[in-house]
């Protein structure tokens, strides 16, 4: 039996099923009236008393059953409250564990990051030491070169004395400027040549593409001419076919209108049976068919349930 609150009819049905067969057996065991005591009135009073006692017993059992069901309902509600409290406690515990895991993960990430930074700093320090050694070696190499280039410095000093320049760095700057200008001119010439080559390549591709397009257009023109000739030769056939299509479309349109009208009539009948306002548009045939189908399905389910109950009554 369900733990929910039972209706009076359900309780009556339950007690009828539980005690009806037992009462029938007890009644069958009763002695025949013809073979009973000579005082039928006394016998009837005794049986009436037994019937009242049995009725009171059934009423008491019914009350006890109702109280038991109420107790079970209360226990069920208490279990629901305890279950909700347990779920809340589990959720809080999971949230607390998740927060601790997140803190632990952040701490581990921070420690890993600090170790990585320390390792990077050590690598950077080693790299700087190596660069310092390399710079010292470069300084020694440049110092040696400076001694080797001392003769060239003397030569440049003489050049300054016999030219328009006043300092050696002006001569060097002028030389660097001329070298840079020569490099720029050569680069510009190379870029110009590359542009010319690219333009030639684009022109060749353009000419080739246009030749291909002309050939494709000629082929397309020939194909369209053939299609035009075939269409012109079959114009009578297609005109008759078009007339047939129009006639068929008119019949289909008439049939569709008939179907929509019949569907609308059925929908209005269903709406009257349902006794409720529907917001279905008159032209929404699909929605109307859906509601008609649902109405038929509901009535079929009701009829099946009625037949099932009738069969149960027949068995009882």
UniProtKB/Swiss-Prot annotation:
Predominant place of localization: cytoplasm
Stretches assigned to coiled coil: 39-146, 178-232
Organism domain of life: Eukaryota
GO cellular component, as recorded: centrosome; manchette; perinuclear region of cytoplasm; sperm head-tail coupling apparatus; sperm principal piece
Keywords linked to the UniProt accession: Cell projection, Cilium, Coiled coil, Cytoplasm, Cytoskeleton, Differentiation, Flagellum, Spermatogenesis
Signal peptide bounds: none
Pfam families documented for this protein: DUF4200
InterPro entries the record matches: CFAP_domain-containing, DUF4200
GO terms for biological process, alphabetical: acrosome assembly; centrosome cycle; cilium assembly; spermatid development
Cellular compartment(s): Cytoplasm, Perinuclear region; Cytoplasm, Cytoskeleton; Cell projection, Cilium, Flagellum; Cytoplasm, Cytoskeleton, Microtubule organizing center, Centrosome
Family under the similarity heading: Belongs to the CFAP73 family.
Protein function: Essential for male fertility. Required for sperm development.
Subunit structure: Interacts with ODF1 and ODF2. Interacts with CCDC38. Interacts with CCDC146. Interacts with CFAP53.
Listed name of the protein: Coiled-coil domain-containing protein 42
Gene: CCDC42
